[in-house]
Amino acid sequence: MTDIKSMTIDELKELMTTLGDKPFRAKQIYSWLHEHLVTSYDEMTNLSKSLREKLKEYPVTALKMVDVQTSRIDGTQKYLFRLSDGNVIESVLMRYKHGNSVCISSQVGCRMGCRFCASTIGGLTRCLLPSEMLDQIYRIQALTGERVSNVVVMGTGEPLDNYENLLRFIHILTEDGGLHISQRNLTVSTCGLVPKIYDLAKEKLQMTLALSLHAPNDVKRRELMPIANKYSMDEVLEACRYYFKETGRRITFEYSLVAGVNDSDEDARELSGRIRDMNCHVNLIPVNPIKERSFVRSTRQAVENFKIKLEKYGINVTIRREMGSDIDGACGQLRKSYMEKTESEK
């Protein structure tokens, strides 16, 4: 099946030629799909009825909302969407003074196996299509009536493990004729797929790369992240340096603090020594507890002390603001709870 919502304007022009219609119709269809966010050809009122009938051979797929949870604390909303094949994914809308940010999933499940993450429990089911990544943003914008200005690809899945679809998603999201979200308002996370970081750098996109570091050395990183058995910290950091060299975009290092594992003064000193020469920013994240893991989040004082130590060594650092802490806010937890409930009801 042709996924029309994943097609570029040039590909739509080719489709128009195939259907015996004018190429300029491609921009009209593209605008309906990606700017006006329609989900039916019948809504494309400037197209002829005959063209709309022909296009119905190429269904416009749309996510269906299964559940939404709203935080009473800050208005953060966590959405559970069903895909056309019955799989479910989750997305998060976070409201800030500077605008609305949506965190999207890039895969159904994840195969990276990071030990503190709920998303990877159960492994990888499949990669998301560009249209399925886009539609998380489109559905949330349509449901709320509020414009999305920032997008973070930090939900379930490893974005660089879905590389080609990710690039197409970015192209459509940031292009004229659609939502036209600035590349500078886009952040993509990775656990450290080194070859793909180099590939992404060569694209020279103006987005932020967020590297999930979570440890000051290889020994501790291997305990937390299986990917560290394949790529050393030196290799990962060198790839990040290359990304900055090619794009001029400062690297963000995500660092989840686990009590007694990676939150000591020595950890802060060692980490700063590894990244002090880099144009970077460290985002400290108190780890979210999940029942399948024994990890305990660092105390508030330990997090603050770690921040102070890094600042002492000249590192730019912030503590991530916790959004939606009264709902299943941790990545993968709403989907996991839903799947467990569905399984128990069988």
Describe each model-derived feature in a short phrase.
Residues 85-99:
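P-loop NTP-binding catalytic core
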Residues 1-89, 241-250, 255-346:
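Auxiliary Fe-S-binding modules of radical SAM enzymes
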Residues 141-150, 155-313, 317:
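Conserved AdoMet/S-adenosylmethionine-binding subsite of the radical SAM
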Residues 95-132:
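Canonical Radical SAM [4Fe-4S] cluster-binding loop centered on the CxxxCxxC motif
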Residues 71, 105-106, 119, 189, ...:
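Short linear Ser/Thr-Pro motifs
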